A protein has these predicted regions:
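C-terminal accessory/tail domains of diverse enzymes
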Residues: 1-65, 78-257
Length: 257
């Protein structure tokens, strides 16, 4: 988990967290007083405790968020090409919900670009699973060869990492990265977002059905997509209510503008 924030005392956060294994650094997408806290990789209850520790430290030292800030979640995931193809289509299907439960600034953000502006359902389905990496990199680079693709996958920095769903991270370091969420120092918001992402990843890994995913894409409105996701992912009522309430909140903001 990478938490971006602005406006506080960088040195105090560094002194509090660096010795506990957290990464603490500046971020080029933020102002000079910006910070990125990288929560150590962990599982289960420990993730919850570490995220809470980071959020409390940021708030204690005066940090908040602006529309420049994002929340990036990395989750270790199997890298078999067929599974990656399924995950790409499922994330494409979920994107309207992801953007609808976040501020409009995320949709128009250079650092979390939507898949649906560069990919189509048809091309994802028709692409051979063994060439899904080539399809992903082709959205930023012309005249790709397999040699170039192999080179890209060994490099830390690549322009394709700025999609809301960053497959480059999986090819490079075996973690999928989701960049859709707006910046927050709320421990509860972060953990609910992680719970939703994990439910999606588990579905793709163990219960994936392409026809179900296509039906999700065909749902005519965000609320119907959320209700369909609840059934598909077996989401509990509190998480579903949270997602719906965020959708209503940001829809009202849009209507007021």
């Amino acid at each position: 988990v990478e938490i971006e924030a602005e406006g506080g005392d960088y040195d105090d956060v560094y002194d509090d967290l660096a010795d506990e294994g957290f990464g603490v650094q500046g971020d080029g997408s933020l102002d000079e007083d910006g910070i990125e806290v990288q929560v150590p990789a962990s599982n289960g209850d420990n993730t919850d405790k570490l995220v809470q520790r980071a959020c409390q430290c940021l708030e204690k030292n005066g940090f908040g968020v602006s529309k420049r800030c994002g929340l990036h979640v990395h989750i270790e995931y199997p890298s078999q090409m067929r599974t990656i193809k399924h995950l790409l289509l499922m994330t494409y299907a979920c994107e309207p919900v992801f953007y609808a439960i976040n501020p409009q600034s995320r949709l128009n953000n250079t650092y979390c670009q939507p898949l649906n502006k560069r990919f189509s359902v048809h091309e994802i389905i028709q692409t051979n699973a063994q060439k899904i990496d080539e399809l992903f990199y082709s959205k930023k680079y012309a005249d790709l060869t397999r040699s170039k693709v192999r080179t890209f996958k060994r490099m830390k920095w690549n322009d394709c990492r700025y999609f809301g769903f960053n497959l480059h991270s999986l090819f490079y370091q075996k973690t999928v990265e989701f960049r859709y969420h707006a910046g927050t120092t709320s421990h509860q918001k972060i953990m609910r977002w992680i719970t939703l992402l994990k439910a999606i990843l588990l579905y793709v890994r163990f219960r994936y059905n392409q026809e179900d995913v296509l039906r999700l894409i065909e749902q005519p409105a965000v609320l119907s997509k959320i209700r369909y996701l609840k059934q598909l992912l077996k989401l509990d009522e509190p998480l579903t209510d949270y997602i719906i309430n965020r959708y209503i909140k940001f829809r009202m903001h849009l209507c007021a503008e």
